[in-house]
């Protein structure tokens, strides 16, 4: 039985592990944390867990057929989203032909992380926790590296990236319904959001490439309280790791002698930074690459077909004059109700694999 090492027990790493175990491999997943979704050592959140909702457009049936994994038990339908865009508010109901879902991230039994972990264990995957890999040279060739936003893999493997900075607040709520609130405002050329699912709630304000001043956090905090009635007792300044959005050439399936998966591979939307869909898809492709580099590379390039277009759009968005940016954003959200049925899945064509699996 051939052995396979996977570094990182995130979504892509566990999807790869499940698929390889089903193919007869003896799979070991090495994870730096003490458990799946466990205590983190990232700057600003040392010794705490990240328990928050993560939203994504996704066709569950297609994803299940593609990856061999049905995540519907932990995917909560999201019907609408409140958007505060440069001083204007729009509540958007998602077009039914392009469904959106929230998944919980973290160590609780209701999270997608724990769900995939339990599936992996059922397939015979072994996990080695509190096992930080710093010497990648010691890993066997074709090891799968799926270390996500956080970790030491970016520089040793030569993957272009931008550091991400921001503020994060987390807590619990008695409200049963899932909820997402989005803010686009002049204080960041990225965005801020609030999400709640399975009673876990969190808010995040971030910026790629440069830190945000504390007064920016205070402004977002005030907006949430006044506009949405949402408050948190504690906000933490956080170094959020890195994103694969430094160059239009970021997506890569291989680095040195290794196979990349998830965020590290660049399989994500470079504009809105949706990551769940790409993580699941790239985990499957990484598993394919273990036995067939060429076929996996062709599939990787196919699902990431629109990354360059998305990168250029994100670059332009970052550089636009504020007045023009406001009008572009308002136009897009106002016209979503008729554009979405017209464009259907093309609305999210920059999302890796969306409408292509």
Where in the sequence are the language-model features?
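N-terminal FAD cofactor-binding segment of flavoenzymes
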Residues: 19, 38-85, 165
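Short beta-strand to alpha-helix junction loop
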Residues: 51-58, 95-118, 211-216
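Conserved acidic E/D residue at the C-terminus of a beta-strand in Rossmann-like folds
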Residues: 29-33, 263
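Active-site-proximal substrate-binding core of FAD-dependent oxidoreductases
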Residues: 288-327
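N-terminal Rossmann-like FAD-binding beta1-loop-alpha1 element of flavoenzymes
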Residues: 2-29
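FAD/FMN-dependent oxidoreductases across multiple families
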Residues: 76, 212-291, 295
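Predominantly flavin-linked oxidoreductase catalytic cores and closely associated redox partners
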Residues: 110, 114-232, 266
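C-terminal auxiliary extensions adjacent to catalytic cores
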Residues: 316-357
């Amino acid at each position: 039985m051939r052995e396979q090492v996977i570094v990182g027990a995130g979504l892509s790493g566990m999807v790869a592990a499940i698929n390889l175990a089903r193919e007869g491999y003896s799979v070991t997943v090495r994870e730096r944390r003490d458990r799946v979704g466990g205590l983190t050592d990232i700057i600003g959140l040392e010794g705490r867990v990240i328990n928050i909702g993560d939203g994504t457009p996704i066709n569950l049936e297609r994803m299940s057929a593609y990856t061999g994994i049905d995540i519907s038990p932990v995917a909560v339908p999201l019907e609408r989203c409140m958007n505060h865009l440069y001083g204007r508010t729009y509540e958007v109901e998602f077009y039914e032909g392009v469904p959106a879902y929230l998944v919980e991230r973290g160590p609780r039994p209701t999270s997608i992380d724990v769900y995939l972990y339990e599936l992996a264990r059922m397939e015979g995957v072994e996990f080695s926790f509190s096992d930080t890999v710093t010497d990648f040279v010691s890993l066997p060739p074709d090891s799968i590296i799926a270390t996500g936003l956080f970790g030491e893999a970016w520089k040793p493997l030569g993957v272009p990236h931008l550091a991400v900075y921001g503020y994060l607040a987390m807590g619990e709520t008695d409200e049963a319904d899932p909820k997402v609130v989005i803010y686009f405002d002049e204080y960041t050329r990225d965005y801020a959001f609030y999400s709640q699912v399975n009673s876990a709630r969190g808010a995040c304000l971030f910026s790629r490439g440069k830190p945000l001043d504390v007064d920016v956090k205070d402004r977002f905090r005030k907006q949430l309280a006044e506009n949405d009635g949402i408050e948190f007792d504690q906000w933490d300044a956080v170094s959020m790791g890195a994103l694969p959005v430094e160059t239009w050439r970021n997506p890569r399936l291989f680095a040195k002698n290794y196979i990349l998966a998830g965020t590290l591979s660049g399989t994500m939307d470079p504009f809105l930074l949706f990551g769940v869909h790409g993580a699941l898809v790239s985990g499957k492709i990484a598993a394919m690459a273990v036995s067939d580099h060429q076929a996996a590379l062709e599939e990787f390039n196919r699902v990431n077909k629109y990354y360059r277009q998305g990168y250029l759009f994100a670059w332009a968005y970052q550089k636009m004059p504020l007045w023009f940016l406001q009008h572009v954003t308002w136009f897009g959200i106002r016209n979503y109700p008729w554009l979405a049925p017209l464009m259907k899945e093309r609305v999210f064509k920059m999302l890796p694999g969306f409408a292509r699996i």
